[in-house]
Every structure is written in structure tokens, then in C-alpha cells.
């Protein structure tokens, strides 16, 4: 497993917190219903967040079309974590273009990360993250980025433990 070293890079070592029956694999079109279920659960769980609380009534139908397109896209992957064959987590990773005037020109962008409550603190996030980082490295990407809700202290601590650091804040101003 990968852990942040003191220099901010990732180092490999075993992680005894991972459940023995936990596996991570790239989702396929056959997994679309599970992907929809997990990713909508993420949005519903954060219904107090100013961005995520605005879930559209037709979100499941929109999700089906959107996530199917994402599953077919060669520049991204959706990973599923399964414990004894039951889906317990999801993570999407995209090979994303960087800013045109800055390095790196491409980076991995991690999003839509969700672990079912009963599977939390059992290494699911770390296993999903490890798969995403391996996928990024296979594509020559040397940096990973993500956004997460500022008020989610548990997620902030988890991402910090995986080597991420805050470099900017997303601000929202309602115009109506």
C-alpha cells in the first residue's frame, strides 16, 4: 500500500487495515446500476453542502446517461471496491488537461469518491486511491488533484493522510 512520506511523495508498505475480502476493479457497463447507486448516495449524504444539496429530481435518469458515457470514455476510469463481492466504494479518476500556461500539462483528477458507511475505516478509501494512483502512473501522470467539501472533517483528515494538501479554496456566490 502507499503512504505519504515526509517529502510529500508516496511510499509503499503493507497496510494491515485492509479487509482480506476487499478487492478493487475497474467498473464496466454491467456495473452501471451500482455506480449510480453509490454516486447518488454520495450526493444525498452531503445534502447540507451548498453545492450538493441542489440534486435535480431527474438525477437518476441523468446519472444513467452521464455515468454510462464515463464508463465508455478511454481517458477516465471508475473503480469499484467490493468486499466479498458486494460493492462498498466507488472512485472516479480522469486524465485531465492542466492549465495551458502551467506545468504539469496533464494530471489525474479524482472525484465522486464514496464509501458506504458500514465499510468506512476498513481501508476501502486507501485501496481505491491506490488503484487510482497506479492508473495515473500508467498514463504518465505525475500529480493527482481533487476537491472535497471543506466542512467534511473526516474526509479532510483522510485525504491529508493520503498525501494531499490544500492549495486553493473553491468559493461560491449565489447570484439569485
List each model region and its residues.
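Conserved GNAT-fold acetyl-CoA-binding loop/helix
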Residues: 40-66
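Conserved acetyl-CoA pyrophosphate-binding loop and the N-cap/start of the following alpha-helix
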Residues: 119, 123-131
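Conserved GNAT acetyl-CoA-binding A-motif
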Residues: 136-147
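Conserved beta-strand-loop-alpha-helix junction that forms the acyl-donor binding cleft
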Residues: 145-155, 172-176
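Conserved beta-strand in the GNAT
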Residues: 80, 86-95, 109, 114
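Conserved N-terminal entry element of GNAT/NAT acetyltransferase domains
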Residues: 1-30
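Conserved active-site alpha-helix within GNAT-family acetyltransferase domains
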Residues: 126, 138, 150-168
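A short beta-loop-alpha structural element at the N-terminal edge
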Residues: 23-37, 46-48
Amino acid at each position: 500500500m502507499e503512504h505519504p512520506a515526509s517529502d510529500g511523495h508516496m511510499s509503499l508498505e503493507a497496510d494491515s487495515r485492509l479487509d482480506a475480502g476487499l478487492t478493487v476493479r475497474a467498473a464496466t457497463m454491467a456495473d452501471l446500476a451500482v455506480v449510480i447507486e453509490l454516486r447518488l448516495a454520495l450526493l444525498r449524504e452531503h445534502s447540507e453542502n451548498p453545492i450538493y444539496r441542489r440534486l435535480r429530481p431527474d438525477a437518476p435518469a441523468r446519472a444513467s446517461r452521464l455515468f454510462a458515457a464515463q464508463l465508455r470514455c478511454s481517458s477516465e476510469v471508475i473503480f469499484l471496491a467490493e468486499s466479498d463481492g458486494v460493492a462498498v466504494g466507488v472512485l472516479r479518476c480522469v486524465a485531465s488537461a492542466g492549465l495551458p500556461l502551467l506545468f504539469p500539462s496533464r494530471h489525474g483528477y479524482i472525484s465522486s469518491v464514496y464509501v458506504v458507511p458500514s465499510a468506512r475505516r476498513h481501508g476501502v478509501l486507501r485501496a481505491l486511491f491506490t488503484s487510482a494512483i497506479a492508473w495515473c502512473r500508467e498514463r504518465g501522470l505525475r500529480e493527482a488533484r481533487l476537491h472535497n467539501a471543506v466542512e467534511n472533517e473526516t474526509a479532510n483528515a483522510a485525504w491529508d493522510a493520503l498525501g494531499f494538501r490544500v492549495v486553493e479554496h473553491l468559493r461560491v456566490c449565489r447570484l439569485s
